[in-house]
Swiss-Prot record:
HAMAP family: Ribosomal_eL40 (MF_00788). InterPro entries: Ribosomal_eL40_arc, Ribosomal_eL40_dom, Ribosomal_eL40_sf, Ribosomal_zn-bd. PANTHER family: 50S RIBOSOMAL PROTEIN L40E, LARGE RIBOSOMAL SUBUNIT PROTEIN EL40. GO terms for cellular component: ribonucleoprotein complex; ribosome. It comes from Ignicoccus hospitalis (strain KIN4/I / DSM 18386 / JCM 14125). This is Large ribosomal subunit protein eL40. Keywords: Ribonucleoprotein, Ribosomal protein. GO terms for biological process: translation. Belongs to the eukaryotic ribosomal protein eL40 family. NCBIfam families: PRK04136.1. GO terms for molecular function: structural constituent of ribosome. Pfam families: Ribosomal_L40e (PF01020).
């Protein structure tokens, strides 16, 4: 069931989608991270996301 309430959409984006992914080991890291928590690499990218329902 898609989320339509704008307040809930903001919560979902913050809790689920706003993460950094380590390019070296693939670990998910918090949005404010500068280094990977698992391998200590600084090669992080934002998680790719599109908010919407399944196709």
């Amino acid at each position: 069931m898609p989320v339509t309430d704008p307040e809930l959409v903001a919560i979902v984006q913050k809790r689920v989608l706003k993460k950094y992914v380590c390019r070296k080991c693939g670990a998910l890291n918090p949005w404010g991270a500068t280094k990977c928590r698992r391998c200590k690499s600084t090669n992080l990218r934002p998680k790719h996301y599109e908010l919407g329902g399944k196709r």
